[in-house]
């Protein structure tokens, strides 16, 4: 058993395990360790001096968990759960319902939504309940499953965002090359999940359920990492590898891909004779696309940077644990599951139509047909169209001449903010 790694990981959870008011008549952990209750701890490889040293270190940054803080956390995490489930389930519903939207790009969007749903269901509620109850109540099996779901979902999300960025780069920078087929998209998604599983297994395997008698009437459990020796180095380099593979490398690829795309969209020239109104419309669309690409990178970087840095610094022993910081950073990272559906799909016309139809059904309007478009065929262009041979269908009534497809120029109307996800 890795002593130091497990001991350091115990810090934030055992702080949360303290009584909210910290009354003197409650023995708590220190009394249990110092007195006869020490035998109630189910640890086989620790000496009593280890626990005495740990109790002394536990005082760093200790803060009480009062009912107000717990209530705020319940509201904050509930907000994430509700909006994440609603947005991501709606994304899957819209894409599976519309056959025109079934392309490789759509598969990546669904895969991202599934990863967000997985972490919303198998990690976010467990973190909340663990904090509110000051103990792990889900058993040994879920101790491993929850940690695996957290890391696997994060890897899948990062790799899928990278795949989407590479796909957008391919479409815009090389418009004459064949698109990724649905079959290849399925293969790429399989590879993504295989890689995510491989990277997540060490975290899941090293989880262990520890049980101790907190007081005469209370027995509590903690789901914590239990790294093999040398535990310090194992923990440090595992978190470092996760930080690089889960955050730095995907962010670097996404940033480079979208920077090149933004440059191409901004510098590309309008082909053919267009009016001033048409030119201004294309320029607005160009700015809109660039803003969306920048938003994707910024949100991905901002949401995960605090938590990744906190975990990395903690495993490197640069900082001590801080309960308030941990839950603030964790909530901020988990909130990223709410943003992706709106970033990638909210500006898509088909998505808006299905959302209006769904809301009409929920409200039981007498004439829901009024919310639907007059014709299933759009008058300007068809989003996400793709033939089986991987080439795009030329849009009708386009502002730009179709002859530019043979000149290697980029058609702005086919690359709306991921927007049309063409």
From Swiss-Prot:
GO terms for biological process: G protein-coupled receptor signaling pathway; neuropeptide signaling pathway; phospholipase C-activating G protein-coupled receptor signaling pathway. InterPro entries: GPCR_Rhodpsn, GPCR_Rhodpsn_7TM, NPY_rcpt. SMART domains: 7TM_GPCR_Srsx (SM01381). The keyword Oxidoreductase does not apply. Glycans are attached at residues 37, 45, 133. The keyword Transmembrane helix applies. Residues 17-70, 129-144, 208-237, 315-326 are extracellular. GO terms for molecular function: G protein-coupled receptor activity; neuropeptide receptor activity; neuropeptide Y receptor activity. G-protein coupled receptor for PEN, a neuropeptide produced from the precursor protein, proSAAS (encoded by PCSK1N). Acts through a G(i)- and G(q)-alpha-alpha-mediated pathway in response to PEN. Plays a role in food intake and body weight regulation. May contribute to the regulation of anxiety-related behaviors. Belongs to the G-protein coupled receptor 1 family. It is found in: Cell membrane. GO terms for cellular component: plasma membrane. Its main location: membrane. It is a multi-pass membrane protein. Residues 92-106, 167-185, 260-292, 348-422 are cytoplasmic. The chain crosses the membrane at residues 71-91, 107-128, 145-166, 186-207, 238-259, 293-314, 327-347. NPY has been reported to be a ligand for GPR83. However, a more recent study found that radiolabeled PEN binding to GPR83 is not affected by NPY concentrations below 1 mM, only very high, non-physiological concentrations causes a partial, displacement of PEN binding. Keywords: Cell membrane, G-protein coupled receptor, Glycoprotein, Membrane, Receptor, Signal, Transducer, Transmembrane, Transmembrane helix. Residues 1-16 form the signal peptide. This is G-protein coupled receptor 83.
